[in-house]
Amino acid sequence: MKRGIAESYNRLVNVFVIACDTCIVGGLFHRFYYWAQDTAWEKTLQASEFQIVATLMLCYLLCAMHTGVILYRRKVFAYEVLTRVTKNVVFFAILGGGILQLGGYMDAWSKLFLAYLLAVLVCVSVFRLGLRMLIKVYRTKGGNLRYVVLVGSTDNNRELYQELTSQSWAGYRVLGYFDFEPNGHFPQECPYLG
């Protein structure tokens, strides 16, 4: 039962993040399309805004589903989130740019498209890092916790206890430890359970 709840939580985070990322991609291109009107950049756009935005959003959705989301993991660091976002945007640039160029929708080699891709990279990175921070705050306040009981009181378990309790944002709470007898070297905050 608990495993099912955790998996549904992970799926919910995945769907939410990918949907928001896709909306960011579409909204950003809408802005860039608006800014390009009545300028020299307008010549790079050979199709309607709807066709280009729909193509870009579909391409980004496919790329995001392929690379995935790691925000729900217990221990994920900012560089891992940024690496995943960068990989996703590179795949998106290749797929989306290729389809736009081959379909004759726009010139994918233009500076407008490059600026758009850089804006996508920055906005999606900021969104995902902000969401990761919110997940950390939620877990620090007691949401989505995992309760842990350690078996044994060896040096490894003491280090594991320190690792699990030093970062409350990871969402672990240690209830205590089992061993043959209480260990004086184990922290007092971790009760002996038997």
Where are these regions (language model features)?
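A solvent-exposed beta-alpha-beta segment
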Residues: 26, 133-194
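Signature of alpha-helical transmembrane segments in polytopic membrane proteins
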Residues: 1-140, 172
